Amino acid sequence: MRIHSPYPASWALAQRIGYLYSEGEIIYLADTPFERLLDIQRQVGQCQTMTSLSQADFEARLEAVFHQNTGESQQIAQDIDQSVDLLSLSEEMPANEDLLNEDSAAPVIRLINAILSEAIKETASDIHIETYEKTMSIRFRIDGVLRTILQPNKKLAALLISRIKVMARLDIAEKRIPQDGRISLRIGRRNIDVRVSTLPSIYGERAVLRLLDKNSLQLSLNNLGMTAADKQDLENLIQLPHGIILVTGPTGSGKSTTLYAILSALNTPGRNILTVEDPVEYELEGIGQTQVNTRVDMSFARGLRAILRQDPDVVMVGEIRDTETAQIAVQASLTGHLVLSTLHTNSASGAVTRLRDMGVESFLLSSSLAGIIAQRLVRRLCPQCRQFTPVSPQQAQMFKYHQLAVTTIGTPVGCPHCHQSGYQGRMAIHEMMVVTPELRAAIHENVDEQALERLVRQQHKALIKNGLQKVISGDTSWDEVMRVASATLESEA
């Protein structure tokens, strides 16, 4: 929602009248001249809702509208449909600009719009605006890898970051401490949530913008890229009445997407599903979502305690970070709740060790754990240019070790379709650990991680084997699987 472009905020405040085109509503002050009302009606059409407001309400409506979206969405939507020359835009920007200027034609706003639109077109997950001694750099994280997009004059760094702060409602005068904010954009039917993080450095502030396209999330177990056997195991796990299901992996490995897909599969009128997250990345209809807020001592542990008093059937904790949260999660699972959460470990069996290190007793773990999913994200080979090449002797040895027969594998090439990278999009590789009676007994007996890993391998495929299968099918490359799964090779040795 925003004021129609011919009527910017400054005009609306001065003329005491504004047109909210997405609402089909004209708002005005009680003492606005009648001639002015007639004039705006002639311009926008007669069939509009007319709302008389007090001075305070009028200013509040304008402030809410312009802080949420000051022309960015409309301009971004236009930019997405046309080729944007970021370099020429950065070169025409003056070193000084009115940061509070709401005119979407202002150079700083045009450049911010162009950067955002280019990132959305390229399906970037993050935008990095970085300052160094003599230069500044704007990089996009595309398919998990940072790519330099623009290196404008360093003089523009403070101006760009200050403008982003205005959009995110941060303090533009405070440059000494980190700040976090958000920008909500609506582009056509797409809702884009932009998480903004600023950080002071020795050469000026840096900013990272995380883009969350709420419409791009495919919340279905079918879209997780699991094998038929792993998907069946997961479907069986989430139908259990109680227990803990963990998703493990490093930051940016798709753990949240997997959890949201599980929640969507469980989301029925007969279940009360509650979450505590940091932050709430995607809003799910029919699920009660709570956000961690450390400023008021709203931690994972405190939030988990609270939602357990809300008669839940399924509980999702964004991450188990400390002993208190781990112990509450275990107790919740033992008292009849299905608990979903994440941990930062390299393998599924490593999650057991991590929980033990947090102080959870082995006999409690053996009773509460239902299953663990370890996962990584790998880049997909571009289907337009990928080639199949013979395997090397070293590669053949690895495939043979995992009992996989292969003669050729997919390799990246590079073409205009994938910007010469050889890759387009990402997919997950998984390691599924279902806690069987044998595993439950081993956990109860406090066996070490290596012994537990060997027992898991007897029943389930290793993460790297799942990746190698996708190399054989041409979905990803050998280098990608080695890049993300090499740390798991040590545990198999």
UniProtKB/Swiss-Prot annotation:
Induction comment: Silenced by the DNA-binding protein H-NS under standard growth conditions.
Principal subcellular localization: membrane
Cofactor(s) needed by this chain: Zn(2+)
Gene Ontology biological process terms from the UniProt entry: protein secretion by the type II secretion system
Xref: PROSITE patterns: T2SP_E (PS00662)
Catalytic activity: ATP + H2O + cellular proteinSide 1 = ADP + phosphate + cellular proteinSide 2
CDD domains from the UniProt entry: PulE-GspE-like
Record carries keyword Protein transport: yes
GO cellular component: plasma membrane; type II protein secretion system complex
Enzyme Commission number(s) of this protein: 7.4.2.8
The UniProt record lists the keyword ATP-binding: yes
Further details from the record: Part of a cryptic operon that encodes proteins involved in type II secretion machinery in other organisms, but is not expressed in strain K12.
Function: ATPase component of the type II secretion system required for the energy-dependent secretion of extracellular factors such as proteases and toxins from the periplasm. Acts as a molecular motor to provide the energy that is required for assembly of the pseudopilus and the extrusion of substrates generated in the cytoplasm.
UniProt protein name: Putative type II secretion system protein E
Species of provenance: Escherichia coli (strain K12)
